[in-house]
Amino acid sequence: MAEQSAGGQGAPEGRDSRDSREGRGRRDGGRGGRDSDKSNYLERVVAINRVSKVVKGGRRFSFTALVIVGDGNGMVGVGYGKAKEVPAAIAKGVEEARKGFFRVPLIGGTITHPVQGEAAAGVVLLRPASPGTGVIAGGAARAVLECAGVHDILAKSLGSDNAINVVHATVAALKMLQRPEEVAARRGLPIEDVAPAGMLKARRESEALAAAAVREAQTSGAQP
């Protein structure tokens, strides 16, 4: 009888411990799902370097990370992080990039006019391209353009091949871009005399698509 009572008490304990483990697993899974949906930004790590500092006791090593962050729709930023571990350096770079967000004027997936940017020894030339061309650019410049949401462009590096210089030269070029309305207002001319007809047509089409998407979202949200 003693053995039976001992066995009867052991079964509930086993079930309770198993249920507690399953519940703990469900809680962890739910928390991980929330963390995975934290950010919708595009992030590109362009370069990671190991640097050292000579001190009295020897050398201290750390890592630097050059990171590009953008929303893929005209907003982009560049960050440079430094830490003792690679993940921490990337995280610092992402945080700095988000603090330095700026808007890139785009029409139909390309830039508004040719522009050349310079930073230190880096020189980057950007030219608009017709739809379907794609992003014709090197690795460092491509990361900036893709995160900014540029789909068609011709880019060429005319100076240093250093990734940091190329990235900052590309950013300098993008910050020099102007909208056709700004140029027309400064010159006192109608916008048709400043921007090509094809560019204005592409802008009207993109605005129509954006307005249709907004109306569709409002309609779907209003339905019960």
From Swiss-Prot:
Superkingdom of source: Bacteria
Stretch list, region Disordered: 1-38
Domain S5 DRBM, residue spans: 41-104
Keywords: Ribonucleoprotein, Ribosomal protein, RNA-binding, rRNA-binding
Family note: Belongs to the universal ribosomal protein uS5 family.
HAMAP family named in the record: Ribosomal_uS5_B (MF_01307_B)
Domain remarks: The N-terminal domain interacts with the head of the 30S subunit; the C-terminal domain interacts with the body and contacts protein S4. The interaction surface between S4 and S5 is involved in control of translational fidelity.
Primary role: With S4 and S12 plays an important role in translational accuracy. Located at the back of the 30S subunit body where it stabilizes the conformation of the head with respect to the body.
Protein name (database record): Small ribosomal subunit protein uS5
Species of the source: Mycobacterium marinum (strain ATCC BAA-535 / M)
